[in-house]
Swiss-Prot record:
InterPro entries: Glyco_hydro_28, Pectin_lyas_fold, Pectin_lyase_fold/virulence. PANTHER family: PECTIN LYASE SUPERFAMILY PROTEIN-RELATED, PTHR31736. Pfam families: Glyco_hydro_28. This is Probable rhamnogalacturonase A. It comes from Aspergillus flavus (strain ATCC 200026 / FGSC A1120 / IAM 13836 / NRRL 3357 / JCM 12722 / SRRC 167). The active site is at 217 (proton donor), 292. It is found in: Secreted. One of its GO terms (cellular component) is extracellular region.
Length: 467
């Protein structure tokens, strides 16, 4: 799918090659092989699809029997879950969620936490499995103290795919200190409030692709520490937008690529946010972005006032490439499509903005503003960062080629915070003109194995120097 000849690879920039996955991602053993070893059906452990009986104990018992090789199987049906599960250890295991789990109970924490595991898979064989967090029951009273839906800590060689995460009381999906992960074919749908992050990543060697997020905070966001992160075919559908940060002390992020990101009615197309702090971000590519109706477009803000100032001169940003951005922004005079604000004592260096064409939906002018950002393109200045500057450029003519496609599933309004959010169907398209890397599970002639085979093939192609 992205297989290139050695000659073609030699012509690629070092930045693009280096900012790739560092090796294999995803589980080492197929789910079918795990199932043939052992299958632990939660209904054999007391689970009832009555939307009342807590499924937590049944999952724990099934996990105890299948964690060292096998599949915990949750059949189709509606299940209640008042427990907060911490599933620890295990190898060559999987959780197959073909039913729908409804969060009950008022405890915080994590609905599911998987930790210290390897060769793991969390998936639906039908693409109809879901976790319904019913977060509105907290949010209608102004509370964000409910549980996160799905968190991974210290897990290696794993995947999450073909499931929907809906209306989390807090964050939806977090990858904390993990390695060699693949996240794909997902729909995440949250309320119209901050603090309801879609996908948060502070890990190593992670491939996120073909994911739709609706919320009002992070779409797919990289936090520190992180390296070798590839994010592709992302649909931020009335969301906060993709981002990096917030960044604080001892930031350590490198070799990150975002590619094919479509953003509709969100806070930003991409934001890097910090205020003080220390450490660095290096080797970042942001390419093939389409946006419509967003408040901000490219927003690099080293003095972000929405976070408290962190001790330090600032986070050093170096070697950032922004290319092939198209579309429109909400109001280009109030919030221009390019904002690069870097700390005077930690200027941004080696930034390139190329093939960037966005135009305002309101009025007939827009601004490009840069402060202590050095490189090439628009308001950036040449230099090595030894001198400071601040400049604003006003543009009154629409750039050539800014027109861009839209998506047929663009939402007409946000989901609120005081009523249940419906479970969505996982889409089959996440970026205009881009084909998902893997068919939805259960799609091709009802054969989930075809989707699994496609996913496995694409995983092994994504190694350093083979993309």
């Amino acid at each position: 799918m992205h297989s290139l000849s050695l000659i073609s690879l030699a012509l690629l920039s070092p930045l693009l090659v280096n900012a790739q996955l560092s090796g294999h991602v995803g589980p080492l053993t197929s789910s079918s092989s795990k199932a043939s070893t052992k299958t632990c059906n939660v209904q054999d452990y007391g689970a009832k699809a009555d939307k009342e009986t807590d499924i937590g104990s049944a999952i724990e018992k099934a996990w105890d029997d299948c964690a060292e090789g096998g599949v915990v199987y949750i059949p189709s049906g509606d299940y209640a879950m008042s427990s907060r599960l911490k599933l620890s250890g295990g190898k060559a295991s999987a959780i197959q969620l073909d039913g729908i789990i409804y969060r009950t109970g008022s405890d915080g924490g994590n609905l599911f936490m998987i930790e210290h595991s390897s060769d793991f898979e969390f998936f639906s064989s039908t693409s109809q499995g879901a976790i319904q967090g019913l977060g509105y029951e907290f949010h209608k009273d102004g509370s964000l103290n409910g549980p996160r839906l799905l968190r991974f800590y210290d897990v290696t060689d794993f995947s999450v795919h073909d499931v929907a995460l809906v209306d989390s009381p807090a964050f939806h999906l977090s990858l904390d200190t993990c390695k060699n992960a693949e996240i794909y074919n997902m729909a995440i749908r949250g309320g119209d409030s901050g603090g309801l992050d879609g996908v948060d990543i502070w890990s190593e060697n992670v491939w996120v692709h073909d994911v739709e997020v609706t919320n009002k905070d992070e779409c797919v966001t990289v936090k520190s520490p992180a390296k070798n992160i590839l994010v592709e075919n992302i649909y931020c559908n009335w969301s906060g937008g993709c981002a990096m940060g917030s960044l604080g002390a001892d930031t350590n992020i490198s070799d990150v690529v975002y590619r094919n990101v479509y953003t509709w009615k969100s806070n930003q197309m991409y934001m890097i946010k910090s205020n003080g702090g220390s450490g660095s971000v290096s080797n970042l590519v942001l390419e093939n972005f389409i946006g419509h109706g967003n408040a901000y477009s490219l927003d690099i803000d080293g003095e972000w006032s929405s976070m408290s100032t962190v001790s330090g001169d600032g986070v050093q940003l170096n070697n950032i490439t922004v290319r092939n951005w198209k579309g429109t922004e909400e109001d280009g005079a109030a919030r221009g499509p390019i904002k690069v604000v870097c700390a005077e004592k930690a200027p941004c260096t080696d930034i390139t903005i190329d093939d960037f064409a966005l135009w305002t939906e309101s009025g007939d002018e827009q601004t490009y503003s840069c402060e202590n950002g050095f490189g090439s393109g628009f308001c950036l200045q040449d230099g090595d960062g030894t001198s400071s500057y601040s400049t604003v450029i006003t543009e009154t003519a629409a750039p050539t080629g800014y027109e861009a496609s839209s998506m047929s599933n663009d939402l007409s309004t946000a989901f609120g915070t005081d009523a249940s959010i419906p479970i969505p169907t996982i889409p089959t398209s996440f970026f205009p003109g881009a084909t998902p890397y893997s068919a939805l599970a259960g799609a091709a002639s009802g054969n989930a194995a075809k989707a699994t085979s496609s996913a496995t093939a694409s995983r092994f192609r994504h190694r350093r120097g083979s993309h």
